Amino acid sequence: RRGTVQHYFSGAVRVGNARAYKILIVAVLICATVLTMIVVNSLRFNPDPSRDQDFIARAQQKSVPGIKVKASALGGSESRRSFGENLGKYGIQPIWLEIENETDDQLVYLQIATDPDYYSPYEVSYRFHGIFSPAANLARDAFFLKRQIPSVVQPHSHSTGFVYGEADSGIKYARFVIVGSNRLETFDFALSVPGPAFVGTGVHADTIPRDQKVEDLDIDALRKVLTKISCCTTNSDATRLGDPLNLVIVEGERDPIIPFIARDWHLAQKLDIASIVETARAFIFRDEYLTSPVSPLFVFNRREDVAIQKARSTINERIHARLWLTPYTFQSRRIWIGQVSRDIGVRLTDQTWNLTTHKIGPDVDFDRSYLLQDLLMSGFVERYGFVGGVGAATMSDPRRNLTADPYYTDGLRLVAFLSNQTRTLGDIERLPWEQPPAPSDEAR
């Protein structure tokens, strides 16, 4: 019996030792994992601001007496390198900013005017905190805090730093509002963002063929010329008519894309392998794709110079516009002609390589009106009017675009003159040109 008891206790000891050994192994593994996480989290945070000059060099600059502002929006790889973390993963985009105050007054920069949903430095840093690495976390906090631009700029000094805003691609609209003693200054920027290729990020005067003369027009000549431009877009060899050219933009001093991106329009990506794959993914999963490519249309024997769109929550629905630079100017201001229509769904077709196409809404005047309202609400329009040139088409006898979608229209083109200063709705002039007719019984 004594041997049995000794055998029992020795067995229990062996079992206990085995359990203790397993617990020890687990504890060692946990400690090793925690240590690895600490090391990895510390090593991962490796910011490299040494190449910040890349985005500083392309900064845009605007000034008024006594105040100068420079700004640049960072692309994804620039942000990752400069801050040591993938901010784009969380939809965060830093904007580099420099404010020079040459006045005798203290100036205050209002970050909320740049982005109503801007992030605090601690909010950005905390997204990359490690559970077991307090020292690295403190270093991150200090780094992001130090790089935030101060809100106050003392007299005869300058401030530099970053605003942590929501991410955009292609072009980012940024408004900087600076307040002084009895003074308020607003600076609007359309900042280029490195990344995928977009339609319209590099449009300059040399878009017009060098052998084509640019004709400057007065207001009466402008009205006449705009009625004589072709009614519609075409295919690549100009043998078939497409969507109606129902839009004209006359530039002001600002970048003409600003009124659009200020109202949440986005540039369309160029049609390439990457955008095709992303389009397919968004179509399959019914996701939004704010910068999805558009099919090319042609005016002046070239495809659109700029393509912009405002998308809904699914890739199937969006309103989009294509714009072409014309060989005309108005008082030395460049003139664009374009078309605006609304995609209301997707359907099968034998007119495209992938056998599918967006279906446009047939009431293109509705979309023209929407765009006008958006431009008016932006505050960047000084006057507008309507001219002929498209030719009317009715609901009962519609015309068709290149993919055989029917559309009807009153035949008018919207002409919007962009302003050099923001204007209230009551200060915008309506030109006494053509007037859109009241809706007919057929359209009601």
What are these model-predicted stretches?
Residues E102-Q154:
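The feature marks short-to-medium sequence segments in extracytoplasmic or secretory-pathway proteins
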Residues D105-A113, R175, I257-I261:
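Short, hydrophobic/aromatic beta-strand segments
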Residues I229-P259:
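Terminal, regulation- and interaction-focused segments at domain boundaries
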Residues S79-W96, E102-Q106, V152-Q154, D237-A238:
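Short, solvent-exposed beta-strand/turn "edge" segments of beta-rich domains on protein surfaces
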Residues S157, G170, L271-P439:
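A cross-kingdom signal targeting lumenal/periplasmic-facing segments of multi-pass membrane
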Residues M37-L43, D117, R147-R210:
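Surface-exposed edge beta-strand/loop patches
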Residues G11-A32:
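N-terminal Sec-pathway targeting helices
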Residues D48-Y90:
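Low-complexity, acidic Ser/Thr/Pro/Gly-rich terminal tails and inter-domain linkers that flank the onset
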